[in-house]
Amino acid sequence: MGRVALLFLGLLLFGSVLAGPGGPVGDRLLVRYRRADSLFHLDRSTRVTDSLALAGFTAVVNELEKAGARGDTLLTVALLKRGILLDAGGDYARARTAYCGVLGYRPADDSLVFVTQVYVGTVYYNLDRFDSASYFLLRAESLAGRFNDRDNSVRLYNTLGALYCDNGNFRQGRNYFDHALELVRGGKTYDTAAAVSLQINIATASFRVGQYEDALAIYRQLLGYRPLRDYVYENMGRAYAGMEDYPSALAWFRRVSLREIPRVLNEMANAELRLNRPDSCRWYLSRLRELGPSAGSGKIGPLDLGLNAFYGSEELSRRGDVGGALKEVQRAIDLFAGNFNKRDAYGNPVGFSGAFAYYRLFDALVRKAELHNGEKNLEASYATYSAALSLLRYIERSYATDEAKLFLKKNSGIVYAEALAVCLELDRRHPGGDYLEQAFLIGERSKASVITANLEEKAFMGAPEAKGLLGQVDNYKYRIARLNVRSEGVTDSSELAAITREKEGDEIELLRLQKALEQDGEYYRVKYGDASPGIRDLQGELGRNQALVSLYAAGGVLHVFVVTRDGLRHVAVDSLARLERDVEAWLEKLKATGSGGRFNGGAVGQRLFAALVKPIQEAAGGRTEWVIVPDGVFALLPFESLYADATGNQWLVETTTISYRFSSRLLSGEPSSGKSVGSGVLSFAPFGDRGADVFQRLPASKEEIAGLPGLQWLDGQATKERFLATVNQYPIVHLATHAVSSMDNAAGSFIAFYPGKGRTIDNRLYLEELYGLNLQPTRLVIISACETGQGEVVPQEGVISLARAFAYAGCGSTINSLWKADDQATSLILKRFYAHLREGETKARALQLAKLDYLKSDAIDKSPSFWAHLVLTGDSGALYSRRGWVLWVVIGLAVMGAGGIVLFLKRRRV
């Protein structure tokens, strides 16, 4: 495919080629150039004609450089074509020299710069120099829109796609492949070779994210195209291997020509190893090493040799040769890391800017850590796990979309668990050291990393140019979110395809903007910095009566870390599966209790107290304010609903103030408690007087916001448009409305506003739209709608809920509901919350006191089903100083007059 694009290159550049030096020498060089150029453009070129063309261009370049004709158009174009011929012949090192020579002459023609950057970026990719490839390709991408150069744009996007796939970002890679294929299909002449190559790449990106059947369907359609059949065979084998159908994988691998693709020997070795045939595995591995430079037209590069060593390490490990396995995996690390060269099994890379194939390097580091662990060399295992996790965080931060980041987290959580287990074992062997703190920090660094990274970027205060780019990034995130929402209800395949193409284009532009931002050194430091608060930092954020309680579920154990001002304690709760079943049973009881029904916690409540509450109480040392960082299913549990003692006669809410965090890292830098903010609440009650669309009336919602200072929107005025226009004008936002949370499709979760005449999407605020907003000026959002804390549970990231979306957007804290709420009970609790908040209480204490007021009232229903659904997540501090409460007294009288103490009639929200 490489030579086909060169004809289009001639159309762009050769009109100015004849502007070479004048006189007899110049005429002679032009004649020689034209002779070489005619050979260069032959429809059926051969090695001989390419060799003659290369000699001609080389002679022209040498004479012009000798004559000092720097920057001459004839010189730069001849040098470029020399590079292209070397590139096509597989001489990437000399091709790179030629391309860099062109750029070194600083040609004035931007189209020549664009084309050369595409080629030099591609040749750096072929040399496995991924950082340099990325540098030139991204520079070319910034110029691509200025030229109608389809073929080189296809080459650009295809190479960028391959680059991202090789670094594990398969979703972004597919975006580029799809974009390139769209360009090919839109051309006046259809380039079959290019189209087939791109479809192979698209299928490969698909099976790498688990879409095996989709990938195989594409490959089967391409089997008839003979020139690339070996690549189809290879990738079909890899897809079957991904499905763990190793006999079928081997059948396809055996069809591949070793002369064309010698690297397939690695995949054959791996398949044999999975089939427990170690002798065959060793034979294939050694066969690839024997081929080496004699592999014919197929290239064996550092990536192939690294993979060979990686598979070899596992084969040696299975034979019991751990020393040999460590030696081989270290060789793989050296090859994958690029600029790292340490032969001993104790060296680990500390920086990753020169590495390529990040996910391969990550796998190799994990393998090495596991080998050290198996040998009980725990210090070496811990050091290697630390390097692997640093790389993992680097990879995650390099991804442009949260979808890609969450995919990575779902597939790498086990490594954090293994590292934590090693650290805890080291603490057991060496008590009094810092291993317990390191174990705690391993868990905390894994939690809410997507939210944390976004908030750090939002808080970036750099140059005005960088801040402007950040604004564009937010805009594109919002556009992508809107497209995700639009796609949810689309059934027409052509419309869905159009939305998909638009989204892919926006994601490519989002990535380009983020790479442009990374040119700002301070922004790069903020984005990729791996620092996180230590124990002393967190202790400085805690009050004397506070305990930070962090849960980490892994390996059949619930690890409970309790941080107070005077220390760090760890409790391991065994039988995690039983504990999780009890939590789920407790939640079912909370959601199922009917009006007037007596809540019966029974044996489940007793077990939860003994296994969960009591150990925390003991580790907290009598402290009565807990800041809980949950994990897994525990993120859905309102701890205040649990028993406070073994008798079950007291709820935890009666003894303990509780709030929640997505990560302890979000404690640092929070606004100081007690510092007053501007007064006023932005409140919405779209269904106070009447229902609309599919949503029923919520009569108590109007009373819920009645008398609040600030701006109130009721019924038909409570629109999504008004919310977006006014959301950052008040420190508190109160949404008394309906909401829908999806447990298996986060994109379908939304908050309902009053339906206008527009499309449904214009009347609902979807979860992904919230991701694109900047809500940093907002200190508290109260969402009294039901189930706004529900969603898919992603280990170490939390519940993908509407409440999390507000935190992601920068809101300081949220009060949300975990299940279908009683309308009247919710209204009273929130009225009392405002009353305590205006007296200067912290948000956490105000919510606790409001629930206690409810329990002391004459309400009929006092089970936790009616008050435990409301939970506070985020900054728990006060919004108002205690001296600023006088104004609120007047407001409180107005609230009482408008709403009074309501009767408790059962009205559930949907």
Where are these regions (language model features)?
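Amphipathic alpha-helical protein-protein interaction segments
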Residues: 326, 330, 334-337, 341, ...
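Conserved alpha-helical positions within TPR/SEL1-like repeat arrays
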Residues: 40-45, 77-88, 114-126, 152-166, ...
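Structural signature of alpha-solenoid helical repeat junctions
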Residues: 27, 70-74, 112, 152, ...
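Catalytic cores of enzymes
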Residues: 528-910
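N-terminal leader/linker segments that initiate helical-solenoid repeat arrays
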Residues: 18-80
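Amphipathic alpha-helical segments of tetratricopeptide repeats
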Residues: 58-65, 100-105, 139-145, 179-188, ...
